[in-house]
């Protein structure tokens, strides 16, 4: 959660190592099958036509890395749809496109482009009506095989209730902050500046970790409250954790000696600033003892907060929440980024949905989950660099996730590898999946990384436009 602050660079290295390990896990096949089994597949009786004109009854598209191969899918009649789901055996495809037409052999219109498919990729194309789909694999890292296609027209009355929840770094708030996206948000989690000490007291620090007066924090919160006045947006505070020394200070603040003081201070802080809830970003409990202390703390803070929102930033691995504790967590902000593929891509679609599946297997209900998306880039060589999406203005388009950008990483090393972002289309796909999978919402790290909302490539705009189009 702390990609933009130098203060926490050491922690990020730990997160990265853990994420690299996580990325070796299954790639989303199970949850994609479970999710879309609930909807009518409009391609279930389709015919697949090879480039030579031969027709086959089952969908298949295979080839070699150096080939640009395609098949045509005949739905049998002109069909209204908004979603195409493709599945691959393996992890080889790195670029594919979808075209559509109502004529078998001509007048094909470009619909869609993305990169990785793996266990399944939701391709959200908006409201369209066509008979023929032409699927191209443009690039792959080896022999590839696509084995399944689903075509759906999914609308939901529940789409309007999808949470759009963004972290906002308090230090970024000023009179010049861009708040043009506020109408697209339902929740804001205010991260940092306020920080715990080893006894659970709350102190205030600047971006370099130097202690400052609370008035700095209060003034920034006042700016945000003025901007959100009259809007139905929950404001939730996240008080930074005292990382370092194997979490010694965290263990101290959650210990039997200090936990009641920690809870008391959180409750007083939430009440003082009239926040709608409290979020905790604990990355990560490293022992059974830490998990025991964490579970005990969560019971206490839930009781103290009453009807206020209890939110947690959670990574989808090594979940050791007690069963009763899972039930009292209102929102799990699932961190689904900095998880790299063999190609060096972070936060690709299939790895993201696989993380959601792990949360469900870990005992969470789908409505508790906010699917985390990054509004920042990572270099494909995995160096320590996190670049804001908006810094690539002028290099962006709707579909491309790889950006060529020369700079120095946060350790001063020159960068030549491409930057991997989540494009407008990728964010749209993940939003559509969140609706289709009946998730609680979308979570963004972090708010000031985006372009202004009136920019056609704004990622907040991608979320909101998809959310609106998915409504019945």
Label every model-predicted segment:
Residues 18-30:
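Sec-dependent signal peptide cleavage junction
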Residues 26, 55-108, 117-158, 331:
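Aromatic, loop-rich ligand-recognition surfaces of beta-strand-rich domains
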Residues 156-265:
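Glycan-recognition patch characteristic of GH18 chitinases/ENGases
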Residues 165-166, 198-216, 284-396:
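Substrate-binding surface in catalytic domains of secreted glycosidases
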Residues 188, 280, 332, 371, ...:
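Conserved, mostly hydrophobic/aromatic
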Residues 255-278, 297-300, 304, 315-325:
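An active-site-proximal structural segment forming one wall of the substrate-binding cleft
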Residues 263-291, 335-338, 443:
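Active-site groove signature of glycoside hydrolases
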Residues 368-433, 453, 459-472:
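Glycan-binding loop/region signatures in secreted carbohydrate-active enzymes
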């Amino acid at each position: 959660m702390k990609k933009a602050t130098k203060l926490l660079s050491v922690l990020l290295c730990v997160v990265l190592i853990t994420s690299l390990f996580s990325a070796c896990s299954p790639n989303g096949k199970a949850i994609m099958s479970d999710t879309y089994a609930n909807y009518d597949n409009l391609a279930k009786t389709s015919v697949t036509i090879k480039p030579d004109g031969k027709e086959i009854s089952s969908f298949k598209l295979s080839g070699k890395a150096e080939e640009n191969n395609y098949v045509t899918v005949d739905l049998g009649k002109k069909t209204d749809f908004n979603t195409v789901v493709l599945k691959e055996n393996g992890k080889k495809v790195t670029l594919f496109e979808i075209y559509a037409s109502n004529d078998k052999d001509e007048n094909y219109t470009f619909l869609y482009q993305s990169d990785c498919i793996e266990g399944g990729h939701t391709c959200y194309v908006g409201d369209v009506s066509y008979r023929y789909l032409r699927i191209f694999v443009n690039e792959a890292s080896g022999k590839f095989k696509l084995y399944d296609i689903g075509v759906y027209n999914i609308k939901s009355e529940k789409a309007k209730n999808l949470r759009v929840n963004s972290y906002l770094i308090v230090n970024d708030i000023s009179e010049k902050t861009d708040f043009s996206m506020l109408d697209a948000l339902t929740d804001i989690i205010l991260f940092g500046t306020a920080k715990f000490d080893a006894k659970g007291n709350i102190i205030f620090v600047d971006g370099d970790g130097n202690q400052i007066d609370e008035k700095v924090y209060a003034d920034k919160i006042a700016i945000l409250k003025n901007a959100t006045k009259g809007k139905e947006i929950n404001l939730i505070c996240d008080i930074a954790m005292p990382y370092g020394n194997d979490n010694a200070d965290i263990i101290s603040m959650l210990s039997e000696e200090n936990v009641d003081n920690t809870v008391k201070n959180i409750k007083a802080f939430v009440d003082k600033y009239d926040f709608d809830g409290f979020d905790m970003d604990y990355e990560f409990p490293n022992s059974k003892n830490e998990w025991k202390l964490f579970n005990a703390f969560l019971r206490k803070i839930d009781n103290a907060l009453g009807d206020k929102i209890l939110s947690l930033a959670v990574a989808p691995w090594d979940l050791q929440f007690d069963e009763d504790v899972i039930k009292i967590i209102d929102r799990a902000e699932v961190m689904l980024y900095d998880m790299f593929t063999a190609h060096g891509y972070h936060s690709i679609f299939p790895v993201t949905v696989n993380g959601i599946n792990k949360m469900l297997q870990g005992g969470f209900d789908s409505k508790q989950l906010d699917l985390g998306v990054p509004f920042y880039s990572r270099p494909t060589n995995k160096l320590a660099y996190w670049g804001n999406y908006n810094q690539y203005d002028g290099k962006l388009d709707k579909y491309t996730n790889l950006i060529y950008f020369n700079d120095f990483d946060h350790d001063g090393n020159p960068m030549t590898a491409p930057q991997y972002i989540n494009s407008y289309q990728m964010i749209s796909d993940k939003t559509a999946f969140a609706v289709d999978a009946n998730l609680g919402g979308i979570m963004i790290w972090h708010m000031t990384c985006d372009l202004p909302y009136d920019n056609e490539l704004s990622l907040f705009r991608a979320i909101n436009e998809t959310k609106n189009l998915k409504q019945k």
